[in-house]
Design a protein with these regions (language model features):
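Short, structured coil/loop segments at alpha-helix boundaries
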Residues: 66, 78, 85-86, 130, ...
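Active-site lining segments that contact anionic ligands and/or coordinate catalytic metals
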Residues: 12, 37, 94, 121, ...
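A structural-propensity feature for long, helix-poor, extended segments
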Residues: 129-183
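Short, small-residue-biased leader/transition segments that mark boundaries at the very start
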Residues: 1-6
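A generic structural signal for short, non-catalytic loop/turn and secondary-structure boundary residues
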Residues: 8-10, 35-36, 90-91, 138, ...
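NTP/phosphate- and nucleic-acid-binding module
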Residues: 30-32, 49-50, 57-62, 68-70, ...
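Non-catalytic terminal/interface segments that mediate subunit docking, oligomerization
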Residues: 7-125
Length: 191
């Protein structure tokens, strides 16, 4: 058979990829720590759509520049979220999201997981998470948790410090329930 486009290694090594001023390299995620300690950086209500998480419209032009596009995560709900999350990420503090029912409904927008990942979000704890959005979260290294008791959502507050000990082992074992500890409120939450 004939091969299409065979290039030798020397020629490939000389090829450069040019990106325009608005195209950045895709970000990589850090590995999940053994024990996840973080801060609830935002608490959102029920029925948060992917458009609430990652606005489109005039912001969509930045989709190839994840650092820039990430400046608008949760903008319709909390315009200061991305600044807060980036500051915590830069201090090596993981960001956590607390959410109500049907988190991530709407269009399957990968950037609604990619941009929060870039900002250091490691887990979403929700009453329920839409199936496709949950898959996108997993694909970008964000753990989608649902509360065993939906009422636990009510006890969590923005800025609470939360720890999920043994998270990496729990993921590898496929545990169906994990314990989280709200260190600020002194309460245990089952996810």
């Amino acid at each position: 058979g004939s091969e299409m486009c065979i290039r030798d290694r020397d020629e490939r090594a000389r090829i450069s990829i040019y990106r325009g001023p608005n195209i950045g390299a895709p970000p990589a995620n850090d590995p999940m720590p053994e024990d996840l300690r973080g801060k609830i950086t935002i608490k959102v209500d029920d029925y948060v759509t992917t458009d609430h998480i990652m606005p489109a419209g005039s912001r969509l032009k930045y989709r190839s520049n994840v650092p820039k596009y990430s400046e608008f995560v949760f903008e319709p709900l909390d315009p200061e979220f991305s600044r807060r999350a980036a500051e915590l990420r830069d201090q090596d503090v993981h960001n956590l999201v607390a959410a109500g029912v049907s988190y991530g409904q709407g269009s399957s927008r990968e950037h609604a997981a990619l941009c929060p990942m870039y900002l250091g979000v490691k887990a979403v704890m929700a009453k329920s998470i839409e199936r496709i959005h949950a898959a996108n979260l997993v694909n970008f290294g964000i753990v989608p948790f649902t509360f065993v008791k939906e009422s636990d959502y009510d006890s969590l507050k923005r800025d609470d410090d939360v720890e999920i000990p043994g998270i990496r082992d729990a993921i590898e074992r496929g545990d169906e329930v994990v314990e989280a500890f709200d260190r600020t409120a002194g309460e245990k939450v089952l996810l």
